[in-house]
Amino acid sequence: MAKLRSATSTQGRNMAGARALWRATGVKDSDFGKPIVAIANSFTQFVPGHVHLKDMGSLVAGAIEEAGGIAKEFNTIAVDDGIAMGHGGMLYSLPSRELIADSVEYMVNAHCADALVCISNCDKITPGMLMAALRLNIPVVFVSGGPMEAGKTKLSDKLIKLDLVDAMVAAADDRVSDEDSEKIERSACPTCGSCSGMFTANSMNCLTEALGLSLPGNGSLLATHSDRRELFLEAGRRVMALANRYYRDDDESALPRNIASFKAFENAMALDIAMGGSSNTVLHLLAAAQEAKVDFTMADIDRLSRQVPHLCKVAPSTPKYHMEDVHRAGGVMGILGELDRAGLLHTDVSHVAGENLKAVLVQYDLVQTQDEAVQQFYAAGPAGIPTTKAFSQSCRWPSLDVDRQEGCIRTREFAFSQEGGLAVLSGNIAADGCIVKTAGVDEANHTFVGHARVYESQDDAVAGILGGEVVAGDVVVIRYEGPKGGPGMQEMLYPTSYLKSKGLGTSCALITDGRFSGGTSGLSIGHVSPEAAAGGTIALVETGDRIEIDIPARSITLAVSDEVLETRRQAMQARGKQAWKPVNRERSVSLALKAYAMLATSADKGAVRDVSKLED
């Protein structure tokens, strides 16, 4: 029998002081010896995806205590990438992932918790908690706050569906009237929850289902729907079942590293490719794999991207479908079911919702389930009423979307495309690879040749786009925005949105060592590695250089000879301490961000810390 970690602080005469303090938190004599389950909540009033989470910890705690455990809740920070977008606040977004991971580790280890429930939702919170859970390797269940309902409004007497990106594009488009822009803004984010498309937050919450660490519906069931209450209660029950399996029965298969195995990471990446998920998921899966001690790399992602078809197309890649539509079609389990039937899924992997993924699919794959309760579960739909309250409505779709030929989720035969929604490109400008969300790229732009227009920062690029410097045929190059060079690897949603608003969304490309919001579409290539600040070739590009992009061939090439590049590299090195740094960029960087930059690796490593610098 594995010893409870909490026994360190609850057992023995020498722990009298610790027990006295535990009693002061409400622990009774009869509780000592029970598993202590930490609840990492990320409630904050700053973020719509988290504003409704305040009472969720109490729901989970009640279920834990009914199942025989002690529940103790704490909070983490949560940055809203949308609110932080377009100014210096975005420098803090990716670094907050490491801070969240560390804070969960600190709390769990400092108090010797035996198990963990992670209540997350938005962009960096789920990845940070995932990294911590795999680092700690104690029984864990994830439960997110759920997606926002899609916005809806009437323009020219036509009802349209909206999300955050639509508001940003409309605001920058001179052809949109002030009245229509305001209508779109007021309708884009109608409820609490993570933004309604297949952006980073929803992508990551879906991926926890595929990794085996969250319950079916976690990524797709609306935040406002009353059915979601049961997910929180069941998370508390499940984590206690996992804790008992490990501590009482010596069953190590209950530990997250044995659930999130290499096969599970392949499943998660296959899901991401099939649903056209955010390119940020690549960054976060690579980081999580390192915490799990799983050798999952960009090479594996490249291999999968060539095998997995695009089975589910969701905003921002199409205005037709949002997360509420994915749920109606069977959610993550519906997509995984189609991957299974295509022979592209490992179903023998463990899962917190059942004996293994195969058993979970039998019950929750909408195509094969005979369970009427599950069918009712996927009928949970939007109410269309603005609210910040969780569980505030119980509306049901009048019918389910089981059309696998023309519906939201397709079979392999009727896939949106036979190659998936993400691709890894490489070439002399990105020797260690870069990422493009092909789900959002027009097929006509799968090959593109243009001339570089180079900017040393996102701010300069935005000014150039809005000021008319960028013209059709340009390849906008934004560098020194990587994990180290930014620092913090800013998202480039404003530059891509402004290209759209200027009518350049399909006639220009954008490449960067920064990253993109899950809301980005168009020929937007990010995560260029090595980044400029790490000596990457992207630092040597000059305005006017020819750049060739070939997605089918998975290549991206700076059409400059090796001899010329070597001359430029030597000139860069001659700058001494100013080498591999932006020229004339004015940016205030705090000590906290400088500390982050000192250890940050490039995107192909997940932008995790370079641990070699910490070794003796």
From Swiss-Prot:
Function (record text): Functions in the biosynthesis of branched-chain amino acids. Catalyzes the dehydration of (2R,3R)-2,3-dihydroxy-3-methylpentanoate (2,3-dihydroxy-3-methylvalerate) into 2-oxo-3-methylpentanoate (2-oxo-3-methylvalerate) and of (2R)-2,3-dihydroxy-3-methylbutanoate (2,3-dihydroxyisovalerate) into 2-oxo-3-methylbutanoate (2-oxoisovalerate), the penultimate precursor to L-isoleucine and L-valine, respectively.
HAMAP family: IlvD
Recorded family membership: Belongs to the IlvD/Edd family.
Metabolic or biological pathway: Amino-acid biosynthesis; L-isoleucine biosynthesis; L-isoleucine from 2-oxobutanoate: step 3/4; Amino-acid biosynthesis; L-valine biosynthesis; L-valine from pyruvate: step 3/4
UniProt-recorded name of the protein: Dihydroxy-acid dehydratase
CC per GO annotation: cytosol
Residue positions where N6-carboxylysine is found in the record: K124
GO molecular function: 2 iron, 2 sulfur cluster binding; dihydroxy-acid dehydratase activity; magnesium ion binding
Quaternary structure and interacting proteins, as annotated: Homodimer.
Domain of life: Bacteria
Active site: S517
GO biological process assignments: isoleucine biosynthetic process; L-valine biosynthetic process
Cofactor note: Binds 1 [2Fe-2S] cluster per subunit. This cluster acts as a Lewis acid cofactor.
EC number: 4.2.1.9
Residue numbers binding [2Fe-2S] cluster: C122, C195
Binding site for Mg(2+): D81, D123, K124, E491
